[in-house]
Amino acid sequence: MSMFCYQCQEASQGIGCTVRGVCGKTDDVANLQDLLIFTLKGISFLNLKARETGVNKEKTDRFLFEGLFSTITNVNFDRNFFINKIKEAVALREEIKEDLKKAGIEVDESCEAIHWVYDTDEDIEAIAAEVGVLSTKDEDIRSLRELITYGVKGMAAYAYHAYQLGYKDDNIFRFMEKALAKVLDDSLTADDYVALALEAGKYGVDTMALLDKANTSTYGHPEITKVNIGVRNNPGILISGHDLKDLEQLLEQTAGTGVDVYTHGEMLPAHYYPAFKKYPHFVGNYGNAWWQQDREFELFNGPILMTTNCLVPPKDSYKDRVYTTGVVGFEGVKYIPEGPDGKKDFSEIIEHAKRCKPPVEIERGEIIGGFAHNQVLELADKIVEAVKTGAIKRFFVMAGCDGRMKSRTYYTEFAKALPKDTVILTAGCAKYRYNKLNLGDINGIPRVLDAGQCNDSYSLAVIAMKLKEVFGLNDINKLPISYNIAWYEQKAVIVLLALLYLGVKNIHLGPTLPAFLSPNVTKVLVDKFGIGGITNVEDDMKMFMGE
């Protein structure tokens, strides 16, 4: 069996993975993910009609965003998960068709995504090998369809987290279905798909705003916080991913047990929320970005809870200490389900932790963060004054993702080389390339302002829009802000589309441009939006500083 996947930045040779994913997923899992997405497109086509007649069901919304989320890079590697999810998808699809039939609505059965069937698991795998990315023959149409699909995957991840906290917006689900249905439509042109990609950006903004509201309404607005990066002499649980509700439940259930809780990777910004500061056993952050987890999980000694991406296929030496939940999966790893009441029982992982040694100290000290939009706007007068007096000459948005590629040391060197009168605005795990450097401050304003997780790129957009208003500008691109963004997976795609929708131009993406962008589509993005790549620190610095 072979595969073709080019959805992440590490696509093999900058083209695509064809034998095994650089991420570690096998060819059969890659193909099953393709078939799940294909079937979700069919469900979306049908559910749009169901919405029009009022026979749609909320369970379809949840199935859609959970299914999409499970196919994001480094979320789920489990073949059986995808076999079962595809079977559930087909059953749901047929249920929607039956509901439409009862409502007197005819369904166009010519679309294969709506009518394919199976008898055995072997049938599923055979069909999976035929419906992947390369089934769209036109390179440019394929490129745009995948750009939109990956953007919708990112949107689904953010919608999932908002939903977990009780926040949803039917307009977002309607758009996700519309977009997925349209990528099946062979009558659409490249121009149609460019317009749809920008519309995805609009709903990307809406979804990030919804998640921001969900997080801040539930846990308070992030505030300036110093986070411990050392350890204590108690057994611990390391929680990674992005799911704040999982963290909340874990903290509640570990209270008084003698087990400490540490964050890892993208869970670091949880420390910035006021609601989590009441837990004395919420110790700090352990380690760095996701791709270093093989070494860091080994040294942590205690169990690890993966709530979302990014999971790296675990080594045998610590695999028995890895637990997954939500849509995360890996064969042979323990899974903690959600109960009928929406709650999770973490007693097994807590008891496991009690039997483990305390974590090995790998660093010590503190890092500072919590500069989401509400906190930064409280400092607005100070920041505006620093800009007006020339103390701050330029802001650099360096949000995004980190990854394994050695060339990503560029971002560390770039941060070091920035003039002392510049400030970095960041969100996402890209921060780990420079958030432990001693870059100082400007009139008490740290030179690295960390807004939070990748979805908190929304905060950076809010900050930019507010600065535009304060300075009386009619164009966001007239602000002294440059965009040098590191990307890795599909949530970064929806952040990019959101920025393009907001009118931001001259965004530079690295360490490489997406493999899924064809030369012609890349040219459109360059000509229309000024999208660019990166070269080397010295030349890029001159370009950004206008030298």
From Swiss-Prot:
* Cofactor(s) needed for function: [4Fe-4S] cluster; hybrid [4Fe-2O-2S] cluster
Kindly indicate whether the keyword 4Fe-4S belongs to this entry.
Answer: yes
Keyword hit for Oxidoreductase: yes
- Give the UniProt entry's GO cellular component terms: cytoplasm
Q: Which domain of life is it from?
A: Bacteria
Q: What is its EC number?
A: 1.7.99.1
Q: Which GO terms describe its biological process?
A: response to hydrogen peroxide
The entry marks the following residues as binding [4Fe-4S] cluster, namely 5, 8, 17, 23
Localization of this protein: Cytoplasm
Binding residues for hybrid [4Fe-2O-2S] cluster, per the UniProt record? Answer: 242, 266, 310, 401, 429, 454, 489, 491
**Gene Ontology MF annotations:** 4 iron, 4 sulfur cluster binding; hydroxylamine reductase activity; metal ion binding; peroxidase activity
How the cofactor binds, per note? Binds 1 [4Fe-4S] cluster. Binds 1 hybrid [4Fe-2O-2S] cluster.
- What family name appears in the similarity comment? Belongs to the HCP family.
Purpose: Catalyzes the reduction of hydroxylamine to form NH(3) and H(2)O.
Q: What is this protein called?
A: Hydroxylamine reductase
Organism per entry? Thermoanaerobacter pseudethanolicus (strain ATCC 33223 / 39E) (Clostridium thermohydrosulfuricum)
